[in-house]
Amino acid sequence: MSTTLIKGGTVVSATGRVAADVLVDGARIVAVLEPGSTALGHDLASTVDAVIDATGKYVIPGGIDAHTHMQLPFGGTFASDTFETGTAAAAWGGTTSIIDFAVQRTGEKVQDGLAHWHELAAGNCHVDYGFHQIIGGVDEDSLAALPKLIDEGITSFKMFMAYPGVFYSDDAQILKAMQISADTGLMTMMHAENGPVIDVLAEQLVKQGKIEPYYHGIARAWQAEEEATHRAIMLSHLTGAPLYVVHVSAKQAVAQLATARDNGQNVFGETCPQYLYMSLEEQLGAMSDEWGGFEGAKYVCSTPLRSREEGHQDHMWQALRTNDLQMVSTDHCPFCMKDQKELGKGDFRAIPNGIGSIEHRMDLMYQGVVTGQITLERWVELTSTTPARMFGLYGTKGVIQPGADADIVVYDPNGHTSIGVDKTHHMNMDHSAWEGYEIDGHVDVVISRGTVLVSDGEFHGTKGHGSFLKRGLSQYLI
Ligand code: URP
Ligand code: ZN
Ligand code: ZN
């Protein structure tokens, strides 16, 4: 086993920052020491196998992206990142664990969907990975399978109030699944949008000839998000199920979550970088360009981008500060323009939903520190510590302390990152919704369980290094 000393940096946690050296032995952190400590009677730097100089830099726990979709089947195609390409991109961006979504659809057995996801990921990942379980078909069989997931290390499942005919669950199905969630402690994750209402609005728009990507966001009105969020909260209240609402983008949905939390409910919410930075107005602007009005397809995701005029983006930042929202995940769901997004050229409903961001989450959220939206500590909390606690990984992940996995990022606040397909892009996509974003900060070194994956602008990872994470129940419940 080899030893590494990360020396001279500022160790940042969710609760504070301290000048300290971090000693790694094999895959674990074994000590957090006073800078230059000679507590053991000698200068550690001269006896360890490797020294990483972190002078002037932040030393943070590796990012945990708790919402990704590698190879997700959607709209007649598949998300374009494999577990291999997507986890390499994650590592480049300072994310050392992901939680992806195994898929079960109507008529399929949960166990089969899960086994398939294990096949896709095993031996292919560069960073550690866990799974949530999508229940796309709630029936007696899938309900019976839910409690058994806990022994498999899968302690959360997602249902959809959107996408009728695909992944959709009605209220009766949701109620039954939530009763099991309440009994077992499994976290219910919810895609909270009123799908039937959205589908009618979308059909009406298309009939009026409004077929461009921008109308995706018009059909998916914030009222549909607020209403579904409220309904999910009420069903969680009725059953006692812990509820985690994914990809929140409407300020009205945040207000629903805040009220429920004020009432003492175990209700949580995540947002994603796109809802902090991008807007419906930008998507409108992309209607008249070289793509013939279609460039807005790169912004098509659900929930959709919201109007900046209505102030949703500022409200999301505020909710992150006040803990009305607890986490930032990417909902990484990449599709290329060519042959994928293009499927919806004549009808926005056929555009596969999703944006690729796994590589940029740590940088984009650090930009919130630079602009004063969040503190340094909150950056770590939102991107690593809370994801670990929320999804049963805390202690081994999400923190720099003795005994934890040595998942560590050395982040240079004086570095710079220019995001662009030809610059810093390792995701398997032919475009980036983040093209042209400039970040004051840089992911310098990325370590996963003691192994350096990225340093000096070079990738040293090997596929298969990433291990499956058997998760415990949430450590975040009140
Ligand atoms: O646009 C999105 N979010 N695509 C992925 C599927 C989902 O609903 O998370
Ligand atoms: Zn969703
Ligand atoms: Zn998603």
Predicted stretch roles:
Residues 1-46:
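N-terminal metal-binding scaffold of metallo-dependent hydrolase/deaminase domains
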Residues 9, 27, 56, 67, ...:
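Divalent metal-coordination and catalytic microenvironments
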Residues 45, 54-124, 141:
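Metal-associated gating/positioning segment near the N- to mid-region
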Residues 99-100, 130-133, 242-247:
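Short catalytic-loop micro-motif centered on adjacent basic/acidic residues
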Residues 111-127, 175-190:
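Alpha-helix-loop-beta-strand connector modules within alpha/beta enzyme cores
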Residues 141-328, 344:
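Histidine/acidic residue-rich metal-binding segments in metalloenzymes
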Residues 210-240, 292, 296-299, 322-328, ...:
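His/Asp/Glu-enriched, well-ordered alpha-helical/loop segment
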Residues 342-347, 353, 402-469:
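C-terminal cap of metal-dependent C-N hydrolases
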